[in-house]
Swiss-Prot record:
The lineage of its organism: Bacteria, Bacillati, Bacillota, Bacilli, Lactobacillales. This is Lipoprotein signal peptidase. Its main location: membrane. GO terms for biological process: proteolysis. It is a multi-pass membrane protein. It catalyses: Release of signal peptides from bacterial membrane prolipoproteins. Hydrolyzes -Xaa-Yaa-Zaa-|-(S,diacylglyceryl)Cys-, in which Xaa is hydrophobic (preferably Leu), and Yaa (Ala or Ser) and Zaa (Gly or Ala) have small, neutral side chains. One of its GO terms (cellular component) is plasma membrane. The chain crosses the membrane at residues 2-22, 59-79, 81-101, 122-142. Pathway: Protein modification; lipoprotein biosynthesis (signal peptide cleavage). This protein specifically catalyzes the removal of signal peptides from prolipoproteins. Belongs to the peptidase A8 family. Pfam families: Peptidase_A8 (PF01252). GO terms for molecular function: aspartic-type endopeptidase activity. The active site is at residues 111, 127.
Length: 148
């Protein structure tokens, strides 16, 4: 269990560090192409959730985040002997805290990864942690279902 705590901390530092770098080095609303026709770093502010849903509802995000972190903390402890769930929950905690830090500190979330080959919302490291965390939870649930 204790191996996952440093992972959470490292992911949060990576998320916050990249967000800081983007904010300092790329002008708001502009992009720097990393891989032509594939990926750009774009400095955008998102005061909503994915696809800017619930834009400007910071109180709502604060309450939901605190409740979610409480639940994740409970499952982090309860499922501490299951490495697959621990990996998933650790990613979910890192992603949740990464974006929560932005919301509390800035009032918005800094997003930066823009896919150039398809129309997809701009996202950040915390969003990737959340996405992979959910995918791993689904895999763990399917695995548990097969084991029964």
């Amino acid at each position: 269990m204790w191996l996952y705590i440093p992972m959470i901390i490292i992911l949060i530092i990576a998320d916050q560090g990249l967000k800081f770098w983007i904010s300092v080095n790329i002008k708001l609303g502009t992009s720097q192409v990393i891989l032509p026709n594939v990926l750009a770093l774009t400095n955008v502010r998102n005061d909503g959730a994915a696809w800017s849903v619930l834009s400007g509802q910071q109180w709502f995000f604060t309450v939901i985040t605190i409740v979610a972190l409480g639940l994740m903390g409970y499952f982090f402890w309860k499922l501490r002997s299951d490495n697959l769930y621990m990996l998933a929950i650790s990613l979910l905690i890192a992603g949740t805290l990464g974006n929560f830090i932005d919301r509390i500190r800035l009032g918005y979330v800094v997003d930066m990864f823009e896919t150039l080959f398809m129309n997809f919302p701009i996202f950040n490291v915390a969003d990737m942690c959340l996405t992979f965390g959910v995918i791993i939870v689904i895999i763990a649930l399917i695995k548990d279902e097969k084991d029964e």
